[in-house]
């Protein structure tokens, strides 16, 4: 059986208030997180101190790369929890919304590198960029997390982020 992971975000910039990342599994289970400001502040501080091993041709390029890697680390955290909940996976398709800012190839390679041991059948072509319909379940879920709708959040699996885990993923 093929497991479908669909990834979207709600908000225009990862560093803005109430920015959320959503993972929809098989068009049913909703995983998500609203990134706490404390985690953003701690990771930005480490980045500014040069602790992230992020390279770039300019400061702007480094900052963009940090933004992409931070975003991808959150996606990885959501997927790790979903995979843990699902158990063994045969085949996987990963659809990433095209409104996620950044370089798709870097997101794709980070996901591939992170999950090839866990999902041996995963191929680079299984990770694609797509546009999700609006309205849709994933779009509604993004709004639910962004607005912190407590009633609707009861139907979702909320992931608590770990600063050290994100830091280690970003640095890889």
Annotate the PLM regions.
Residues 11, 29, 100-102:
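Residues that cap or initiate secondary-structure elements
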Residues 48-83:
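Acidic helix/loop or adjacent segment enriched in Glu/Asp that either coordinates divalent metal
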Residues 72, 76-172:
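A two-mode feature
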Residues 27-49:
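Short glycine-rich, Thr/Ser-proximal phosphate-binding strand/loop in the N-terminal lobe
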Residues 10, 35-38, 98:
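Short loop/turn segments at strand-loop or loop-helix junctions that form parts
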Residues 16-17, 103:
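Short, function-defining helix-loop hinge/capping sites that tune catalysis or transport
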Residues 1-14:
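Two-metal-ion RNase H-like nuclease active-site motif
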Residues 19-26:
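Short beta-strand scaffold segments in enzyme catalytic cores
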